[in-house]
Amino acid sequence: MRKTPTKKAMKTKTTPYDVAEHLRTPEEMAAYLDAWLEEAPDDAAGIARALGDIARAKGMTQVAKDAGLSRESLYRALSAEGNPSFATVLKVARALGVKLHAEAA
């Protein structure tokens, strides 16, 4: 019995997607945060991570400086385990050049 030759399985190398690499303009950054606020308004940790993504896109060192925080404090506050105070969120938003706004539900 003759065996049919088989092709070796090709392995595809993947890399994790990092949204911060794709946030290039202030408009893209604002739209990204707005999407989080619109789609997951009760997900405080997700919104904090979104702020962290934008901060990484802009440069954590500069954002921390502009927010009056240490770089380490900024990373910690905006990490998945972080729980930033509202004051910190406001400082970071100002440093990022984005505004949080309210509208009637």
Map each language-model feature to its residues.
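Extended, folded domain segments that form the structural surfaces/walls around functional sites
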Residues: 32, 74-76, 84
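N-terminal flexible/basic segments that precede or flank functional cores
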Residues: 1-49, 53
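Short alpha-helical DNA-recognition segment
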Residues: 56-76
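DNA major-groove recognition helix of helix-turn-helix/homeodomain DNA-binding modules
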Residues: 85-103
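Short beta->alpha connector loops at strand-helix junctions that form conserved
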Residues: 78, 104
